[in-house]
């Protein structure tokens, strides 16, 4: 079962197979020194104390030197076994985490709507560690402990032949299988509790991630006590589940030891009844103990396998998730892109909830198209289909007449720049954050993009200029500054298609004015989709698509739509009233 379940992942040991083999080899040396060496020494050393005919001179020195020799072999073999296994284990853990992370990078956005960030972090960091333990430490134990057991049993067979105590030896060996009985009974319980504990660990990570990502909101709404209670409840639930796992895990060793004690006592009773010599009794009891010790450790291995199996189930959920936005088998090459986008009878749904229903539209090259409508009408979904964040259920989306599913995702997305409503910056320098759209850009190119985005002046005002660290998610910059860096990214990419997800909706008037000026420059000579929440954003749009209930119910200029479309008129008038009351630009409700 172990090989069948974990076998496919042993390939991760291939780059460190030499170190892994060395570790196993030294483990066998340590096992042989423990399983047969110690009982053998005891058999010959007991007569030194009990016999009148004691060895003398060199014979005594050689006999006594066997003690440090056996312990040296055992200790050195154990150390080198542990070192090489740790080396192989860390390499496997590194590769496992990279493998899972790489898979996550290629999963569609829909996957992240169904799985929270904290749980995914737990799978990448925690569950990979459990799998690494199974692949390295378990295999090590499955080689080393049986070798100790076989060595000890081999010594018992040797004594059986040399001392003619076949009956006693059979009785002694018959007690060994009794130690295996608790392993299976407890293993099933550990598997169940481990699955629950690992799932709860993911939930705890999610609570922590949400809290740390919403520090301002927690303070602003006095949610500290609520958040402490949430975190405490999650920690306590994990504690209860982990405690149950530990209870079953740690129960196994005492049960095996108790069984061992009864078995040794029974064997000693039989030995006394048969008048077996003290040195033989001592060596037999030592050999029997060396049999029970690996059985106890193998019981622990069984528990480790159960825990790793629960982790493997969670990892394979990620690894075996199908990419619902697959690459084309033979992608067509992209040449000079003009930017013509066509939606042909497109239908799309989120979990059977229709978001777009048989939508058809044509966007000419270099046109700026504003997408307006009530919340949930389909504006964002429409824009997200262009870079293939999702795939249509029915119909097609074409770029310059080519179905975008026939293009490689990398080629398609290289032609599209995106400026989001809340632009995320990475914890790096300003220059490197702008370079995300063109990693090999020179500093002069970065500065030129920043100038076009009206960002150069405020960047130069920082002491470190373009080498200024922005902090986690850009926390050291204002909202307007973050947005202008995101716009600079888009300028640097210089893509023929740009998607603007209302980048001015949460800004003050001054920041909005600067960003509007930058966006006007960004829209020139490009095909632009503007997801509009503020009607001030669409002043320069060539056409406006009005969405309602997953359909485009009208399209035209502002003047045409205001006169002919009741929904558009209602949305605009509602924002106009808001503008009059707040002395600001209209914002969509």
Can you annotate each of these PLM segments?
Residues 2-17, 120:
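A short amphipathic helical element positioned immediately N-terminal to and/or at the very start
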Residues 83-102, 116, 143, 171-216, ...:
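Cytoplasmic coupling helices
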Residues 51-52, 155-177, 248-313, 318-319:
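Helix-loop-helix
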Residues 90, 110, 118, 122, ...:
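Short active-site loops of ABC-family nucleotide-binding domains
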Residues 335-589:
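ABC-type nucleotide-binding domain
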Residues 28-36, 71-79, 131-134, 138-153, ...:
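Hydrophobic alpha-helical transmembrane bundles that constitute the permease/transmembrane domains
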Residues 14-18, 109-110, 126-135, 139, ...:
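An intracellular "coupling" helix at the cytosolic face of ABC transporter transmembrane type-1 domains
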Residues 2, 20-80, 84, 157-170, ...:
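Transmembrane helix-loop-helix hairpins at lipid-water interfaces of multipass membrane proteins
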């Amino acid at each position: 079962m172990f090989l069948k379940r974990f076998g496919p992942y042993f390939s991760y040991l291939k780059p460190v197979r030499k170190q892994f083999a060395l570790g196993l080899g030294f483990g066998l040396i340590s096992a042989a020194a423990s399983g047969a060496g110690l009982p053998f020494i005891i058999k010959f050393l007991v007569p030194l104390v009990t016999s009148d005919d004691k060895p003398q001179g060199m014979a005594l020195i050689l006999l006594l030197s066997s003690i440090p020799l056996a312990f040296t072999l055992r200790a050195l073999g154990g150390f080198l076994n542990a070192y090489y296994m740790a080396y192989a284990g860390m390499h496997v853990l590194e590769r496992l985490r990279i493998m899972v992370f790489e898979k996550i990078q290629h999963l569609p956005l829909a996957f992240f709507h169904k799985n929270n960030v904290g749980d995914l972090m737990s799978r990448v960091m925690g569950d990979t560690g459990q799998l690494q333990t199974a692949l390295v430490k378990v295999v090590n134990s499955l080689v080393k402990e049986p070798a100790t057991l076989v060595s000890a049993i081999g010594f018992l067979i040797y004594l059986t032949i040399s001392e003619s105590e076949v009956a006693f030896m059979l009785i002694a060996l018959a007690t060994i299988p009794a130690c295996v009985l608790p392993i299976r009974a407890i293993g099933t319980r550990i598997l169940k509790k481990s699955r629950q504990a690992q799932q709860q660990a993911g939930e705890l990570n999610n609570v922590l991630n949400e809290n740390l990502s919403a520090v301002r909101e927690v303070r602003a709404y006095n949610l500290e006590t609520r958040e402490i209670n949430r975190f405490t409840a999650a920690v306590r639930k994990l504690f209860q589940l982990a405690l149950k796992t530990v209870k079953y895990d740690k129960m196994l060793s005492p049960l095996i030891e108790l069984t061992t004690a009864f078995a040794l006592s029974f064997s000693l009773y039989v030995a006394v009844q048969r008048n077996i010599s003290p040195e033989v009794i001592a060596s037999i009891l030592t050999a029997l103990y060396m049999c029970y010790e690996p059985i106890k450790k193998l019981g622990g291995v069984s528990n480790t396998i159960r825990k790793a199996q629960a982790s493997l189930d969670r990892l394979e959920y990620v690894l075996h998730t199908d990419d619902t936005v697959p690459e084309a088998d033979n992608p067509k090459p992209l040449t000079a892109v003009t930017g013509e986008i066509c939606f042909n009878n497109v239908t799309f749904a989120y979990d059977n909830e229709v978001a777009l229903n048989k939508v058809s539209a044509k966007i000419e090259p270099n046109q700026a198209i504003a997408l307006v409508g009530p919340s949930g009408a389909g504006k964002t979904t429409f824009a997200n289909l262009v870079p293939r964040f999702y795939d249509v259920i029915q119909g097609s989306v074409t770029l310059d007449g080519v179905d975008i599913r026939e293009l490689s995702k990398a080629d398609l997305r290289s032609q599209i720049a995106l400026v989001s409503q809340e632009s995320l910056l990475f914890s790096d320098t300003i220059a490197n954050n702008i370079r995300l759209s063109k990693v090999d850009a020179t500093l002069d190119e970065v500065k030129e993009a920043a100038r076009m985005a009206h960002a150069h002046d405020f960047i130069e005002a920082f002491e470190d200029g373009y080498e200024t660290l922005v902090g986690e998610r850009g926390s050291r910059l204002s909202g307007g500054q973050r947005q202008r860096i995101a716009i600079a990214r888009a300028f640097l990419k210089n893509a023929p298609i740009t998607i603007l997800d209302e980048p001015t909706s949460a800004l003050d008037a001054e920041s909005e004015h600067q960003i509007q000026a930058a966006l006007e420059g960004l829209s020139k000579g490009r095909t632009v989709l503007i997801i509009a929440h503020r009607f001030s954003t669409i002043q320069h749009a060539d056409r406006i698509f009005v969405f309602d209930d997953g359909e485009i119910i009208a399209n035209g200029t502002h003047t045409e739509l205001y006169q002919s479309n009741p929904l558009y008129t209602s949305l605009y008038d509602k924002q106009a009233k808001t503008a009059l009351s707040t002395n600001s630009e209209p914002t969509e409700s």
